[in-house]
Amino acid sequence: MGKLIELLLHPSELSAAIHYKLWRQPLHPRDLSKESTELRRCYELLDVCSRSFAAVIRELHPEVRDAVMLFYLILRALDTIEDDMTLSRDIKIPILRDFTKCMKTPGWKFTDSDPNERDRVVLQEFPVVMTEFNKLKPKYQEVIYDITDRMGNGMADYVIDDDFNNNGVDTIAAYDLYCHHVAGIVGEGLTRITILAGFGTDVLHENPRLQESMGLFLQKVNIIRDYREDIDVNRAFWPREIWHKYAEEMRDFKDPKYSKKALHCTSDLVANALGHATDCLDYLDNVTDPSTFTFCAIPQVMAIATLDLVYRNPDVFQKNVKLRKGTTVSLILEASNVSGVCDIFTRYARKVYKKSDPNDPNYFRVSVLCGKIEQHAALIKRQRGPPAKTIAQLEGERKEMALSLIVCLAVIFSMSGLMAYIAYVSGFRWSPREIFDSKMFPLRD
């Protein structure tokens, strides 16, 4: 009920939600009749692990769809081992360091995960995953083996790092390194798959900083947003080099008396994340396949919108904040091309700037970064020119106009009905005859 009220209060988001549900068609729908039982099961496992990622992966070009899906499941299996607090280091470390050997062992699976681990089913049915993995083109297998090996060893390093586990991240350099191991390496793997498929320009290969920024931007936004969730279980991913400028202990930010310092700290972290935004735009500008572009763009526009949500928001320190469903759907529909993504980044950069407080020590830095994002987005749009509209897009716009009218009328009638109901339960009574007889509104003398 709450989500419905949210949509009614934001008619444009309601319109987007209806459009997404009724008319949006994937560029490359799956043909289930050509899929093996094992492959269909892998996509079911993908749904178990992440419905949001499952939706965008399913819409990828057939050349890379299965490779990306299996890549995700394998890394999810690896992550499940690392996150399982019921497993001892003696069990975890050998598996994490030698996970590629496990992948090459016929029939290997792991059944000793915590029963409360939702994703343990991937480890339990790992032979099904590997059956389909072994059908991939060797070039994609090679990338996945390499990234999995590096991620597994990186995870093992953090598992045995007592200083990290007890004290969290110390410096900004260590913060970047952690985000690299968690997300940057994944971005490298996806970029290599994209290049091998011929879906990206040489710029992606020649400038690895772009793929690194894609991963770091996403991870840093998640880390800022998840402050309360992490601090409540004694995890700390905000770098001490930043937060210690504003408090003695990171958990102090939960206390309302530190609210001003807490907001200054988030603005410092937001500025750090915003530094990756222009690289993200450059990366997306060099993805040539439409479905791969959408796959890459959707997480990035969610990230910039989330950054606006957490910026100078005291709720971050009291609960886990997240975007409205309607906002998410609107962003998905808008992020269909480079021009749309540039518009989104510009819009949210302006919103961040407008929220800025001149008394915040990070005010100037945030303002400059927002200006750079807006200028860079404008440059990319100018170089590209206006995107040509297809017949399908024009038809979609006509449907959108009709839908907007329907939604507006629906909202008007819904609100009118609600007001009439409130009046009725409050004791007001009237009839059409009273209105026409002017008894409700007697003429003045």
Swiss-Prot record:
Co-factor requirement: Mg(2+)
EC number: 2.5.1.21
Topological type in the membrane: Multi-pass membrane protein
InterPro entries: Isoprenoid_synthase_dom_sf (IPR008949), Squ/phyt_synthse (IPR002060), Squal_synth-like (IPR006449), Squalene/phytoene_synthase_CS (IPR019845), Trans_IPPS_euk-type (IPR044844), Trans_IPPS_HH (IPR033904)
GO CC terms in record: endoplasmic reticulum membrane
Keyword Zinc-finger on entry: no
Pathway annotation: Terpene metabolism; lanosterol biosynthesis; lanosterol from farnesyl diphosphate: step 1/3
Compartments in which it is found: Endoplasmic reticulum membrane
Function per UniProt: Catalyzes the condensation of 2 two farnesyl pyrophosphate moieties to form squalene. It is the first committed enzyme of the sterol biosynthesis pathway. Required for the biosynthesis of ergosterol.
NCBIfam families: squal_synth
Family designation: Belongs to the phytoene/squalene synthase family.
The protein's name: Squalene synthase
